[in-house]
Amino acid sequence: CIATQNHYGAIGTQALPESQLDRFMICMHIGYPDMKYELEIVKGKITTDPLDLVEPVMNGAQLLQLQEEIHKIYIHDAVYQYIGKLVNATRKHSLIELGISPRGTIALARMVQALAYLRGRNYVLPVDVEDVFIDVEAHRIQLNGKARVNRVTAEQVLKDILEGTTKPSVVKK
């Protein structure tokens, strides 16, 4: 499931409750396209419906097979411990009111398996965790009033947690 999110405070929008935010695996900020590309998008939309150009890249059975392959990607105990330490740090951080849930921990483990697969490995490295931690978890945590008053972002807090957590050295299985 892919969704777009309007800026909070825009007319007709309300923040999603934590229980719904927690069901999205990853949150990415794409930003605006440059003017040249945006005009290409507009011109293309006027002459053709972009949905008419969409073609499937795999069928449902192939997708399920791919998911099975990804779930077999090996995660060393030291990497699991690393994930656990990062998650636990969000639950104890002085600027976080609501830390990462078990669902968020599972999402992080699944995402690092997918990233290792895309990188051509059958095992996860700590760098895989570092590379997706903020994108997978920033939308899941709730900052407290002190953080909001000081205009601290969830991304900044998670970056601090990453930098303050010792990364394990793991060798290939």
Model-derived features with residue positions:
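C-terminal engagement/docking regions of AAA+ P-loop ATPases
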Residues: K92-K173
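Alpha-helix initiation/capping motif
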Residues: P17, G31, P56, K72-H76, ...
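Hydrophobic aliphatic residues
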Residues: Q20, V42-I46, V87, F133, ...
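Conserved AAA+ ATPase small/helical "lid" subdomain
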Residues: L53-L108
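Canonical AAA+ ATPase core
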Residues: C1-I73, Q113-L115
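Alpha-helix N-cap and coil->helix boundary residues
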Residues: L16, Y37, Y74, A78, ...
